[in-house]
């Protein structure tokens, strides 16, 4: 009787949603410095899609992608050290160590064919991860990142920006997050993201931002020979021709009118572009 009841519930669920539930399994693995890294894994397939969040975010920001892409790929969403459910016992939150976090997960899962997908700061992180993972990586997808590989900010500008976060982290972060949404954005989504990111541990967030500001991707890019696609909003200019000096196989797809968190703002449109980009990388 219980079996029949369960089957009836499953049929009702599939009829209502048009799909099966994707059950993500949460695991942990230690990074190179011993910090525990939490990640979710779901789906099957020869190719792994590894999603890396941005500054002061976590793996839940990819919730609109995990279920869809788990039908055909092994989907992995990672909490970098100091974020989400991962350990917070790291002294300095560098892009290089974040890259080690990603590499530790991929190597632990023994995935030999990977596309790395990184949002915002995650774009820098996956460059470092690609360097460490070598020929396991078939391509890189940035999400509203890689606007310019060349840093045009002075040290004074960087330090001044960082000081505002150091002096009043919550207020500055909320204002910073709101500025990255378009004026017509869903106010509940804006509030949710602003509240979430401003609740990050300030010392970790400031460390990560400082290291991001002083991170130079060019040396890493010059040693990578990988196709790179970026899906960006049109709020910020992208130095396409300048970037092509450092990445020969480079493409940008724009979502007009979207903000920085495009995978949350317009998930269906974003998922279409992501699906297209994955297909392009796998067919190169």
Residue map of PLM features:
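Alpha/beta-hydrolase fold catalytic core
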Residues: 1-50, 72-73, 199, 279-284
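Catalytic active-site module of serine/aspartate enzymes centered on a nucleophile-bearing elbow/loop
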Residues: 253-284
